[in-house]
C-alpha cells in the first residue's frame, strides 16, 4: 500500500470512530470492507417531523483528493430541494478539500431539516416515492427511515367476528433466503394472518428490525379467506416500487394461497435492474411460500405460472 493510501486509511478510520462516538446508534456500518456507511438524520431526536438518510462510500482517495460518494434518501426530497441540498454538500467539500467532512455534512443536513420543520409541516400523505434511480441502502443497512408511512394503508376496521385473542396475537414471522443481483438484495418475510390487524402487527414487528426498516422498499401483499362470506380480503402495497405490490398479489392469487402475508424487502445497490427487479421480488415470495408449504413444489408452481401466462395469451388472441 502506498504511503498516501495508508495515511488516508488511517484518517478514514479515525473519522469513522469519531462519527460512531458522536452519533451512536444513528450511525451504522453497511459494508466495512467497502467503507459504506449510513446515518439517519432528523430535525428533532425526540419528536422528528422530517427525517433523511445519508449514505456515504469513502473512496481510497478520501479525504486527500476525492470527496465521499453520497446518496440522499427521503420520501419527500425531490426536485429543487434535492438539488439545493446536494449543492450545499458539494460546496462544503470544495471549501474543505483535504479535510474530513462527514460531520459537517451531517450537521448541514440537520440544519436544513430544522429550518424545514420551522417553516412547514409534513403533509398527511407523505410516503415513499423513491424510484429505482434514487438513493438507497444495501445489504446490511440497519437504520430506519420513517417506516410508519407504509402502515397508513392499514387503517381499517377489524371484523367483529374475530376473537380478541386473534386480534392481539402476533403471528410468527419467517425470513427467506436473500437474492442478490448487481448489488441489490431482495429478501422475503412471511407470516400467517387471519385479520387485517395482524397484518399491521407483522409490519410493525418487522420495522423493529432496523435493517428491514431502512430497506429501499418493503413491498407486501396479503390474502385472508373469510369463511363466513366465502370471499378473500386482500390488499397490497408498492412502497414506492411502482406496480410491485400488485404483481406480488397477483402471484399469490395464481398460487391460490390464503391466510398469509408476504413482505419483500429490497435494498438498492446503485445499479438499475429494470424489469429483473420484479422477477426477483416474485421469486423471493414464491420461494418462501413453497418452503412454508403454502403452495406446491417449485416445479408445480412454475407450471401454474406458465399456465396462467398461456391463459392470458389465449385471451388476448381471442380478443383480436
Curated annotation (Swiss-Prot):
Subunit structure as annotated in this protein's UniProt entry: Interacts with GCN1; prevents the interaction of GCN1 with EIF2AK4/GCN2 and inhibits EIF2AK4/GCN2 kinase activity. Interaction with RPL39; this interaction occurs in a GCN1-independent manner. Associates with ribosomes; this interaction occurs in a GCN1-independent manner. Associates with actin; this interaction occurs in a GCN1-independent manner.
Family to which the UniProt record says this protein belongs: Belongs to the IMPACT family.
Main localization (coarse): cytoplasm
Keyword S-adenosyl-L-methionine set for record: no
Region (Disordered): 296-320
Biological process annotations from GO: cellular response to amino acid starvation; GCN2-mediated signaling; intracellular signal transduction; negative regulation of transcription by RNA polymerase II; neuron projection extension; positive regulation of neuron differentiation; regulation of cytoplasmic translational initiation in response to stress; regulation of translational initiation
CDD domains noted in UniProt: RWD_IMPACT (cd23821)
Function: Translational regulator that ensures constant high levels of translation upon a variety of stress conditions, such as amino acid starvation, UV-C irradiation, proteasome inhibitor treatment and glucose deprivation. Plays a role as a negative regulator of the EIF2AK4/GCN2 kinase activity; impairs GCN1-mediated EIF2AK4/GCN2 activation, and hence EIF2AK4/GCN2-mediated eIF-2-alpha phosphorylation and subsequent down-regulation of protein synthesis.
Domain of life: Eukaryota
GO MF term (any one): ribosome binding
SUPFAM superfamilies documented for this protein: Ribosomal protein S5 domain 2-like, UBC-like
Modified residues (Phosphoserine): 297
Organism: Homo sapiens (Human)
Protein location: Cytoplasm
Alphabetical UniProt keywords: Actin-binding, Cytoplasm, Differentiation, Neurogenesis, Phosphoprotein, Repressor, Stress response, Translation regulation
Tissue: Widely expressed. Expressed at high level in brain.
Biased composition range(s): Basic residues: 306-320
Keyword Protein biosynthesis part of the UniProt annotation: no
Taxonomic classification: Eukaryota, Metazoa, Chordata, Craniata, Vertebrata
InterPro entries (alphabetical): Impact, Impact_N, Impact_N_sf, Ribosomal_Su5_D2-typ_SF, RWD_dom, UBQ-conjugating_enzyme/RWD, UPF0029_Impact_CS
SMART domains: RWD (SM00591)
Sequence ranges assigned to domain RWD in this UniProt record: 14-116
GO cellular component: cytoplasm
Further remark: In contrast to the mouse or rabbit ortholog, the IMPACT locus is not imprinted in human.
Gene name of this polypeptide: IMPACT
Record protein name field: Protein IMPACT
Amino acid at each position: 500500500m502506498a504511503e498516501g493510501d495508508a495515511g488516508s486509511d488511517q484518517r478514514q478510520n479515525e473519522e469513522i470512530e469519531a462519527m460512531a462516538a458522536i452519533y451512536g446508534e444513528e450511525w451504522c456500518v453497511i459494508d466495512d470492507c467497502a467503507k459504506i456507511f449510513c446515518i439517519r438524520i432528523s430535525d428533532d431526536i425526540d419528536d422528528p417531523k422530517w427525517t433523511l438518510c445519508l449514505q456515504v462510500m469513502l473512496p481510497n482517495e478520501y479525504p486527500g483528493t476525492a470527496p465521499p460518494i453520497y446518496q440522499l434518501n427521503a420520501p419527500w426530497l425531490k426536485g429543487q430541494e434535492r438539488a439545493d441540498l446536494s449543492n450545499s454538500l458539494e460546496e462544503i467539500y470544495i471549501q474543505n478539500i483535504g479535510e474530513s467532512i462527514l460531520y459537517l455534512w451531517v450537521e448541514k443536513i440537520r440544519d436544513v431539516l430544522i429550518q424545514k420543520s420551522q417553516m412547514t409541516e409534513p403533509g398527511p400523505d407523505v410516503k415513499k416515492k423513491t424510484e429505482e434511480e434514487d438513493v438507497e441502502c444495501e445489504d446490511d443497512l440497519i437504520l430506519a427511515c420513517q417506516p410508519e408511512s407504509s402502515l397508513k394503508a392499514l387503517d381499517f376496521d377489524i371484523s367483529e367476528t374475530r376473537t380478541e385473542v386473534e386480534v392481539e396475537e402476533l403471528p410468527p414471522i419467517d425470513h427467506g433466503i436473500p437474492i442478490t443481483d448487481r448489488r441489490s438484495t431482495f429478501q422475503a418475510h412471511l407470516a400467517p394472518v387471519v385479520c387485517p390487524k395482524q397484518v399491521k402487527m407483522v409490519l410493525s414487528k418487522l420495522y423493529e428490525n432496523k435493517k428491514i426498516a431502512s430497506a429501499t422498499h418493503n413491498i407486501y401483499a396479503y390474502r385472508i379467506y373469510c369463511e363466513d362470506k366465502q370471499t378473500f380480503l386482500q390488499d397490497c402495497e408498492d412502497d414506492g416500487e411502482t406496480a410491485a405490490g400488485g404483481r406480488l398479489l397477483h402471484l399469490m392469487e395464481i398460487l391460490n394461497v390464503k391466510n398469509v402475508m408476504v413482505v419483500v424487502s429490497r435494498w438498492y445497490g446503485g445499479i438499475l435492474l429494470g424489469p429483473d427487479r420484479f422477477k426477483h421480488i416474485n421469486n423471493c415470495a414464491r420461494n418462501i411460500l413453497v418452503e412454508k408449504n403454502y403452495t406446491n413444489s417449485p416445479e408445480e408452481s412454475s407450471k401454474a405460472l406458465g399456465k396462467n401466462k398461456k391463459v392470458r395469451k389465449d385471451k388476448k388472441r381471442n380478443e383480436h
